[in-house]
């Protein structure tokens, strides 16, 4: 009986370590938008977009930059092309996410401001606006979504080296390797402890 409880505890710890708990409404809004965008693309016979953690990091950073900016008809998807404020500190934001500008050239950054981030309005802001051109483009294969306050940002990635949003080779790879090694080692040790 004690062994079965240990196995149950082990399985529970594996489940919790592999599936981080979602503790905020923001993640839910982002998940709803991702599902909506992928359904929209499926209706156009396009491939679904795959979650890209690096693009999500950049989307989060950009949304954070916009959070104190009010929604107007000159911001986000309602703006006239070319009038949306640029990202003057983009190099700093890329650095925070361990990204090199050369791996983001083919990507697209799509900010939208929607009061209270109403899910149906958020999806409409991407699928029924100037952003639909990017969502309809088959070159995009990945997506990262970030939000803060009334702002939600979608970053689209490609499978090309210039749009993959791969981390900079001198910093991101080591950090990923160390974290992956520690997690894998811990799980292996727990497995051995409970099985033998």
Swiss-Prot record:
Query: What are the alphabetically sorted keywords of the record?
Result: Cell membrane, Glycoprotein, GPI-anchor, Lipoprotein, Membrane, Signal
Q: Where is the lipid attached (GPI-anchor amidated serine)?
A: 171
- Does the record's keyword annotation contain Magnesium? no
Positions of glycan attachment: 45, 73, 125, 136
Q: Which GO terms describe its cellular component?
A: plasma membrane; plastid; side of membrane
Intrachain S-S bonds: none
Q: Where does the record place it?
A: Cell membrane
Q: Which residues form the propeptide?
A: 172-196
Q: Does the keyword Nucleotide-binding apply?
A: no
**InterPro entries, A to Z:** At5g19230-like (IPR045285)
Membrane topology per the entry is: Lipid-anchor; GPI-anchor
Any signal peptide, and if so, which residues?
A: 1-24
UniProt record similarity statement? Belongs to the UPF0277 family.
Entry protein name = Uncharacterized GPI-anchored protein At5g19250
